[in-house]
């Protein structure tokens, strides 16, 4: 029987060439064989791109903005993470998904190549939320400081090098966003940008409403915007991850919901780091029309 201490602060494990959090990487065939339902809705993000934010928005849209219904459980139960496994600590994502009624909402950080094939076979709707790489790198660094399921991040400079080479959980940010952007040409994928959502949440939430074939009036939309604002979510124990054991997430090192802004990278990148990042970014993104804003 695996105990929590067996999976904490372990090196990432390669699954089909992609580095995956050690605790999640056992029994991978169960992930591959996962049977989706045709009305499943999948939320996909690269880590630290607004996953919890869009998850709560989708839950509120599906429940017509009913705040009480959305308080029915913690976010990790309402929107289970497909690959989540915390041996000896809590229900796995797969076990939680089996319990949840349809239409289920499932979240994942997996790259396209690791998505269970049943999601493609069932033509499940997918919402992909992308965030600019500089802010993701800073947020991921702080996340790895407090998330004991991840390897220790080292210094910010050391971590940035790992991020740029894709030697972090879920691999290369560049490959992740580019492949999902391309995939939307042949699959029902709503591709959203974190920066657009910060700038004009109503406009972006309306896209979610249309995509999920709901019909919500302005009053309900305003309620959803209010209840999914960063300030409200940071103080909401159902979504701010304080419900997880401190041996897994140590909020004394960094809070799960830290700042929730665009442009915080400027407080961390040195001039040299920024120049190197920009050069690699230009090369990696040269073949795609996908564009990001690093501030709003």
From Swiss-Prot:
One of its GO terms (molecular function) is aryl sulfotransferase activity. The keyword Nucleus does not apply. The active site is at 109 (proton acceptor). It catalyses: a phenol + 3'-phosphoadenylyl sulfate = an aryl sulfate + adenosine 3',5'-bisphosphate + H(+); 3,3',5-triiodo-L-thyronine + 3'-phosphoadenylyl sulfate = 3,3',5-triiodo-L-thyronine sulfate + adenosine 3',5'-bisphosphate + H(+); 3,3',5'-triiodo-L-thyronine + 3'-phosphoadenylyl sulfate = 3,3',5'-triiodo-L-thyronine sulfate + adenosine 3',5'-bisphosphate + H(+); 3,3'-diiodo-L-thyronine + 3'-phosphoadenylyl sulfate = 3,3'-diiodo-L-thyronine sulfate + adenosine 3',5'-bisphosphate + H(+). GO terms for cellular component: cytoplasm; cytosol. Expressed in liver. 3'-phosphoadenylyl sulfate binds at residues 48-53, 131, 139, 194, 228-233, 258-260. It holds the Pfam family Sulfotransfer_1. InterPro entries: P-loop_NTPase, Sulfotransferase_dom. Substrate binds at residues 107-109. Keywords: Cytoplasm, Transferase. It is an enzyme of class 2 (transferase). Its EC number is 2.8.2.1. One of its GO terms (biological process) is sulfation. Its main location: cytoplasm. The keyword Lipid metabolism does not apply. It is found in: Cytoplasm, Cytosol. Sulfotransferase that utilizes 3'-phospho-5'-adenylyl sulfate (PAPS) as sulfonate donor to catalyze the sulfate conjugation of dopamine small phenols such as 1-naphthol and 4-nitrophenol. Also catalyzes the sulfate conjugation of dopamine and thyroid hormones, including 3,3'-diiodothyronine, triidothyronine (T3) and reverse triiodothyronine (rT3). May play a role in gut microbiota-host metabolic interaction. O-sulfonates 4-ethylphenol (4-EP), a dietary tyrosine-derived metabolite produced by gut bacteria. PANTHER family: SULFOTRANSFERASE SULT (PTHR11783). Belongs to the sulfotransferase 1 family. This is Sulfotransferase 1B1.
């Amino acid at each position: 029987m695996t105990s929590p201490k067996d999976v904490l602060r372990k090196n990432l494990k390669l699954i089909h060439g992609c580095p995956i959090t050690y605790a999640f990487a056992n029994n991978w065939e169960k992930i591959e064989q996962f049977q989706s339902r045709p009305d499943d809705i999948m939320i996909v993000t690269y880590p630290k791109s607004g996953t919890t934010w869009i998850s709560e928005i989708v839950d509120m849209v599906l429940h017509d903005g009913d705040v009480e219904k959305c308080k029915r459980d913690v976010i990790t139960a309402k929107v289970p993470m497909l690959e989540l496994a915390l041996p000896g600590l809590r229900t796995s994502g797969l076990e939680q998904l089996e319990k949840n009624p349809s239409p289920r909402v499932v979240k994942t950080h997996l790259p396209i190549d690791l998505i269970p094939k049943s999601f493609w076979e069932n033509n499940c709707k997918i919402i992909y939320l992308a965030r600019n790489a500089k802010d993701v790198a800073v947020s991921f660094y702080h996340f790895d400081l407090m998330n004991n399921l991840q390897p220790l991040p080292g210094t910010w400079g050391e971590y940035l090098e790992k991020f740029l080479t894709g030697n972090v959980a879920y691999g290369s940010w560049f490959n992740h966003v580019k492949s999902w952007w391309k995939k939307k040409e042949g699959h029902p994928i709503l591709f959203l940008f974190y920066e657009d959502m910060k700038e004009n949440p109503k406009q972006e939430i309306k896209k979610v409403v249309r995509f999920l074939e709901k019909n919500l009036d302005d009053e309900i939309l305003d309620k959803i915007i209010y209840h999914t604002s960063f300030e409200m979510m940071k103080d909401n124990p159902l979504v701010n991850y304080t419900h997880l054991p401190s041996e897994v997430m140590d909020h004394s090192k960094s809070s799960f919901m830290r700042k929730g802004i665009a442009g915080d990278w400027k407080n961390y990148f040195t001039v040299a780091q920024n120049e190197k990042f920009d050069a690699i970014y230009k090369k990696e993104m040269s073949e795609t029309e996908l564009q990001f804003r690093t501030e709003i």
